[in-house]
Structure formats: structure tokens, C-alpha cells
């Protein structure tokens, strides 16, 4: 479960785009990875010129086909969640290619970096 401070979240989204953004093409991504791979994800974002994001560290959860990430006991690892809004498909597609490439280097499929893409209805 991810708990979000909505006013802070909305501020982060709004400051990423001008108010005239055509939201028809805007996509929201949630990138989820084992916290161990957070530094690699930040390298990928930098390599792709993406310097706008909101990130939550030490998130807890369990993905389909993965072990739990609870931050204690038998499951000491945690998850990192990074949210990015894109108003252009090109950097998003480049990011997806980079994540696919990084995942080929990560030996265990359960540790792969996951990107979830969603339509973003409106930015106010």
C-alpha cells in the first residue's frame, strides 16, 4: 500500500508542466523496483534527461510473482516507487527501452524494474 500526501503530490505534478499542457497525450507512470535498484533507476532517468519525478522510498508490498517487501523480519527488503508524468511520448518510449535493457542485466526476473503506464486525465 502506498500512502500519498495529495496536496504535495498535486504540487509536484503541476510544477512539472505548464498549465497549457494538452492532457490528451499526457501519461502517468509508476515505476516500482526493489530499493536495492533505486540508484540504477536514478541513473536511467538521468541518462534519459528526466529530471522531474516524485519518489517514495521504503514502500512495502508484494508484486505478482515476487517475494514480499515488508522492511522487516523474514522480508527485510523494501520497494521504491517513482511517479513521472509525461507530456510527450518520445521520452517515455526511450525510458521504457532503457528499463527493458536494464532488466536484461538483472538476473532474477522477480527483481526486474516494473513500469506501469496510466492515462493522466487532467493537470490543474
In which residue ranges do the predicted regions lie?
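Positively charged, small/polar-rich N-terminal and surface patches that mediate targeting and assembly
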Residues: 1-124
Amino acid at each position: 500500500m502506498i500512502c500519498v500526501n495529495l496536496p504535495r503530490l498535486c504540487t509536484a505534478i503541476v510544477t512539472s508542466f505548464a498549465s497549457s499542457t494538452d492532457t490528451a497525450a499526457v501519461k502517468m507512470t509508476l515505476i516500482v523496483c526493489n530499493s536495492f535498484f533505486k540508484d540504477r533507476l536514478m541513473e536511467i532517468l538521468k541518462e534519459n534527461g528526466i529530471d522531474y519525478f516524485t519518489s517514495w522510498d521504503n514502500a512495502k508490498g508484494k508484486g505478482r510473482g515476487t517475494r514480499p517487501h515488508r522492511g522487516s523480519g523474514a522480508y527485510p527488503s523494501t520497494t521504491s516507487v517513482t511517479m513521472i508524468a509525461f507530456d510527450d511520448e518520445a521520452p517515455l518510449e526511450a525510458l521504457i527501452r532503457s528499463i527493458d535493457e536494464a532488466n536484461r542485466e538483472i538476473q532474477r526476473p522477480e527483481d526486474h524494474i516494473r513500469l506501469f503506464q496510466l492515462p493522466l486525465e487532467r493537470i490543474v
